[in-house]
Design a protein with these regions (language model features):
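N-terminal Sec-pathway targeting helices
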Residues: 3-24
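Alpha-helical, hydrophobic structural elements that either
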Residues: 16-19, 29-253
């Protein structure tokens, strides 16, 4: 009887240890996924150029930055999950937009399959063309004609990046892109709330495959990063310590 009781206790402890190990493994994997999916440091800091540095000289550390409070990812269509924008920051005083564009290594595999290639696209090469398209309202007094079916009232203008910094982290590939000449904010009210320009209806990020680049065709993916009238997702902020350090370093060059 004693031997049977001892055996039962051993089996019970073994089962508990096995269950504990399984729980620990699952939690470990989840934590790794959370930590590994965060943007690398190079992708979370403002990338200085002459335009933003001039604005910083005028405004100092009170330089206003408008950024999204959430990631933006393609959630439907043939390129579902291929691309995302993890940060989009408008700097009104510099007429500038900076975004952090991200895609998974699996995107290289799926895009290769979409284009009939035998092997996944090689990591580290310049496969994708990333631009910004802005929809301008040519008749801001009439809100009933603000769609693509009214080309006489809505104009689309494409902006090319003026700078690009690349990085990788685990399974992800990143690009920090700067776009100059983009002015979506007319100023700020007494409470510091941005006054958005009513003639700018929306701001999109378009992704094309460089081997099949044709702006007259549909892009591989499109991400909406700003929509007039939906300013709830836009947060007003100022440069953090890393941004200030980067701007100060740029000014010393």
């Amino acid at each position: 009887m004693a031997r049977s009781s001892t055996t039962s206790r051993i089996i019970g402890w073994a089962i508990r240890l096995l269950i504990g190990a399984m729980i620990f493994s699952v939690v470990g994997v989840l934590l790794w996924r959370i930590l590994s999916s965060g943007d690398p440091a190079s992708m979370t800091v403002l990338q200085p150029n002459e335009q933003i540095f001039a604005a910083y000289q005028e405004e100092g550390e009170q330089l206003q930055i408008l950024h999204q409070q959430h990631d933006i990812i393609i959630r439907d269509g043939p390129s579902k999950g291929y691309f995302s924008v993890t940060q989009s920051e408008f700097i009104p005083a510099a007429d500038q937009l900076q975004i952090t564009f991200r895609y998974n290594n699996s995107t290289l595999k799926y895009v290769a399959e979409d284009y009939g290639k035998a092997a996944p696209l090689e990591r580290g090469k310049d496969w994708f063309d990333v631009t910004v398209t802005i929809a301008y309202d040519l008749t801001p007094d009439n809100a009933d004609d603000n769609d693509i079916n009214h080309p006489d009232s809505v104009r689309f203008e494409r902006y090319q990046p003026t700078a690009c910094v690349k990085d990788t982290k685990n399974l992800y590939n990143y690009e920090r892109l700067t776009f100059d000449g983009i002015d979506i904010c007319a100023g700020f009210d007494e409470q510091g709330v941005p006054i958005m320009r009513p003639e700018i209806l929306a701001v999109y990020v378009d992704i094309y495959f460089n081997e099949d680049l044709d702006y007259e065709q549909e892009p591989l993916g499109t991400l909406l990063i700003y929509l007039y009238g939906d300013e709830r997702s836009v947060l007003v902020d100022t440069p953090d310590k890393k941004d200030v350090a980067a701007l100060e370093e740029f000014g010393q060059k």
